[in-house]
């Protein structure tokens, strides 16, 4: 089976300081993978490289493929990377919505990569596209808020709109960069359950960076832990140990994130969303 994501010898330097060191990684189609690690470990930097939003060092080589197509190599983006991005949904920590537009209009923007540019610039979306956008909002529990301005929603609701936009984009790979970092626990749970449902029901490959290790354990079968720009652990989330987490996070580790047996055996709850 061809990997959905393949990273080979990836290096990245910022202002003379190396952030990623010779990374190699393969993620299979349909996996849900958590990238974990302390702040500054390189997990968000890695995710941006997967989407072609940042380039690796030219001198040290490095290559990234997504869905069997080259994203970048030796510090240069592939000439067709814009087309490839139509198959990569990127969910930002700060939502990246157009807040003056309605919720529905924001979700419709997911279609832009698969329609003529002139139609998109004029907002000429078909009735079928509008139906699909409403179905995506229904799936994330926000159909009744379709006509509201995005600026009126809570942070958790805005993040769910961003996920609905990725659904209309018909992305095969979803990359989520700290999608729950600024959310309250209930909103975070809803967002993670939606991502897990998309992975489970649609077979989409999902890679999510998380600072909250307990969510990685509950929702992601595989964890890749970064420390100082290097992969420190790559394996089942269930095998993460308190000792490893202490090594990763040190004094920054909240004691509540050290797992009890009960937490380790917890299963994600079924997706039951209501508006709000």
Curated annotation (Swiss-Prot):
Specify which residues bind ATP according to the UniProt entry for this protein: 37-44
Lipid bilayer topology: Peripheral membrane protein
Under Pfam families, the record lists: ABC_tran (PF00005)
Enzyme's top EC category: translocase
* EC number(s) given by UniProt: 7.3.2.2
Among the entry's GO cellular component annotations, what is one? plasma membrane
Keyword list, A-Z: ATP-binding, Cell inner membrane, Cell membrane, Membrane, Nucleotide-binding, Phosphonate transport, Translocase, Transport
Output the SUPFAM superfamilies linked to this UniProt entry.
P-loop containing nucleoside triphosphate hydrolases
Q: Where on the tree of life does the source sit, at the highest rank?
A: Bacteria
User: Where is this gene product found?
Assistant: Cell inner membrane
GO MF annotation list: ABC-type phosphonate transporter activity; ATP binding; ATP hydrolysis activity
Reactions accelerated catalytically: phosphonate(out) + ATP + H2O = phosphonate(in) + ADP + phosphate + H(+)
**ABC transporter domain: from which residue to which, for each copy?**
5-253
Which proteins does it associate with, and in what oligomeric form? The complex is composed of two ATP-binding proteins (PhnC), two transmembrane proteins (PhnE) and a solute-binding protein (PhnD).
Function, as annotated: Part of the ABC transporter complex PhnCDE involved in phosphonates import. Responsible for energy coupling to the transport system.
In which family does this protein belong, per the annotation?
A: Belongs to the ABC transporter superfamily. Phosphonates importer (TC 3.A.1.9.1) family.
* Name by which UniProt lists this protein: Phosphonates import ATP-binding protein PhnC
Query: Lineage of the native species?
Result: Bacteria, Pseudomonadati, Pseudomonadota, Gammaproteobacteria, Pseudomonadales
Q: Which gene encodes it?
A: phnC
């Amino acid at each position: 089976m061809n990997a959905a994501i393949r990273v080979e010898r990836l290096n990245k330097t910022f202002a003379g300081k190396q952030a990623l060191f010779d990374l190699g990684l393969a993620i299979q189609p349909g996996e849900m993978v958590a990238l974990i690690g302390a702040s500054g470990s390189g997990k968000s930097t890695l995710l941006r490289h997967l989407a072609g939003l940042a380039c690796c060092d030219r001198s040290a080589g490095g290559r990234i493929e997504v869905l069997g197509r080259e994203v970048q190599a030796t510090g240069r983006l592939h000439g067709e990377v814009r087309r490839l991005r139509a198959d990569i949904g990127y969910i930002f920590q700060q939502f990246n919505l157009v807040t003056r537009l309605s919720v529905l209009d924001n979700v419709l923007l997911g279609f832009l990569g698969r329609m003529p540019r002139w139609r998109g610039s004029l907002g000429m979306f078909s009735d079928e596209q509008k139906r699909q956008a409403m179905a995506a909002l229904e799936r994330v529990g926000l159909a009744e808020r379709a006509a509201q301005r995005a600026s009126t929603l809570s942070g958790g609701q805005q993040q769910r709109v961003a996920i609905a936009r990725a659904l209309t984009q018909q992305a095969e790979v979803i990359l989520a960069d700290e999608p729950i970092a600024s959310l309250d626990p209930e909103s975070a749970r809803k967002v993670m359950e939606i991502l897990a449902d998309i992975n489970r029901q649609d077979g989409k490959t999902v890679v999510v960076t998380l600072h909250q290790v307990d969510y990685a354990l509950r929702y992601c079968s595989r964890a890749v832990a970064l420390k100082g720009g290097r992969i420190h652990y790559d394996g089942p989330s269930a095998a993460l140990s308190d000792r490893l987490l202490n090594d990763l996070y040190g004094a920054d580790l909240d004691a509540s994130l050290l797992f009890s047996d009960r937490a380790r055996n917890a299963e994600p709850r079924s997706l039951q969303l209501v508006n709000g």
